[in-house]
């Protein structure tokens, strides 16, 4: 009898645990000395032309790891082509950028450096500038004996980004049986699964692990009311495959409730508006206001903490 129960518990207990499609966030291994150097570089405006902006100008860590605009301003106030995503929890993404053009965090660093709408510089110029700072160079060389290069600078920044994980979200604590969750948020989670948001937004980061077309059940771009821009082609710009047109990396939703603009084009500026658009264009559904609010409450419960955050 006891044996039977044990076998049952083993089978179904483990099935239940692994069947939950969202998992709690956890920290990942990283090197503290590299994290410290990476942090310095992340906030250093000398990485950009004329010392105008740093990574942190667009990825504001005190809020949600992005800025509160639809399009970020790079050097000389130039506006970017897409909305800045958060850097928090980005280590869990299968690829970086909306179209996945960077294979990992380290590869991503070159994009803002060379982008004329972001840092508008080059590695040789940037390295020459930093090499003049004797104190920084000494500290850097103690950790990276080969000194400053695109490889070592990118590595340090990527290490810092690996440390940007938001822990102890109310939802995670509830999943682990360590905290309670409001009825409304629980209902939101149920709807999130029931309607199929979970088919795309899943795993630790509630997204970030696959690509999907924007507008599965409707012509999102046709209805948007603004002309299609090159960035709207998404993953197609990287692969050239017809099937990848209008396809984007499914964004992680861990900090979605903190955002003020949504989607790659920053076209939506309310959370319930974004959920409504998703229901309509990705699932062919029309949700009630109460359902939208329940899902918003669930998304709010996904917001964890990090020491860089002030709220
Ligand atoms: C001028 C604003 C701006 C600056 C400066 C900037 N970024 Fe970004 N960042 C963006 C935008 C916009 C995107 C989206 C780009 C795309 O998808 O093509 C992005 C994407 C990213 C991503 C991918 C996140 C994801 O979920 O795909 C990471 C990581 C990142 N930036 C880190 C950095 C780092 C590190 C620096 C400094 C070396 C930096 N950014 C500088 C605006 C900026
Ligand atoms: C078919 C896959 C798919 C489904 C189903 C889906 N999404 Fe999305 N979601 C995406 C993609 C892809 C994007 C990015 C689209 C873009 O930027 O143009 C996105 C973006 C979002 C955003 C904006 C995040 C940001 O950083 O701007 C929110 C919020 C969101 N989804 C919530 C939901 C909710 C809630 C549901 C269920 C009602 C849902 N999604 C269903 C694929 C999906």
Regions found by a protein language model. Give the residues of each.
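Sec-dependent signal peptide recognition
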Residues: 1-8
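Hydrophobic h-region of N-terminal signal peptides that target proteins for export
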Residues: 9-17
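Periplasmic c-type cytochrome electron-transfer domains
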Residues: 16-311
């Amino acid at each position: 009898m006891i044996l039977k129960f044990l076998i049952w518990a083993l089978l179904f207990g483990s099935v239940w645990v692994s069947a939950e499609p969202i998992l709690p966030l956890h920290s990942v291994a990283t090197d503290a000395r590299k994290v410290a150097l990476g942090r310095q570089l992340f906030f250093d405006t000398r990485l950009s032309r004329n010392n105008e902006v740093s990574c942190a100008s667009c990825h504001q860590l005190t809020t949600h790891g992005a800025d509160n605009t639809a399009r970020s301003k790079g050097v000389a106030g130039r506006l970017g082509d897409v909305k800045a995503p958060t850097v928090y929890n980005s280590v869990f993404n299968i690829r970086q950028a909306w179209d996945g053009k960077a294979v990992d965090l380290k590869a991503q660093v070159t994009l803002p450096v060379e982008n004329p709408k972001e840092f508008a510089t080059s590695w040789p110029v940037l390295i020459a500038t930093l090499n003049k700072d004797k104190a920084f160079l000494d500290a850097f060389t103690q950790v990276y004996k080969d000194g400053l290069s695109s490889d070592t600078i990118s590595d340090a920044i990527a290490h810092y980004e690996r440390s940007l994980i938001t822990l102890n979200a109310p939802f995670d604590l509830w999943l682990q049986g360590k905290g309670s969750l409001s009825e409304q948020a629980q209902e939101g989670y149920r709807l999130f699964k029931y309607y199929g948001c979970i088919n795309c937004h899943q795993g630790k980061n509630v997204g970030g692990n696959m690509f999907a077309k924007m507008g599965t059940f409707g012509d999102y771009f046709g209805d948007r009311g603004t002309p299609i821009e090159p960035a709207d082609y998404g993953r197609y710009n990287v692969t050239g495959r017809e099937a990848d047109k209008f396809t984007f990396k499914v964004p992680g939703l861990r900090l979605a409730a903190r955002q003020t603009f949504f989607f790659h084009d920053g076209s939506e500026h309310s959370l319930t508006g974004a959920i409504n658009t998703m229901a309509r264009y990705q699932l062919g559904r029309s949700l009630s206001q109460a359902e939208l609010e329940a899902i918003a409450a669930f998304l709010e419960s996904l917001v964890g903490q990090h020491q860089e955050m002030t709220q």
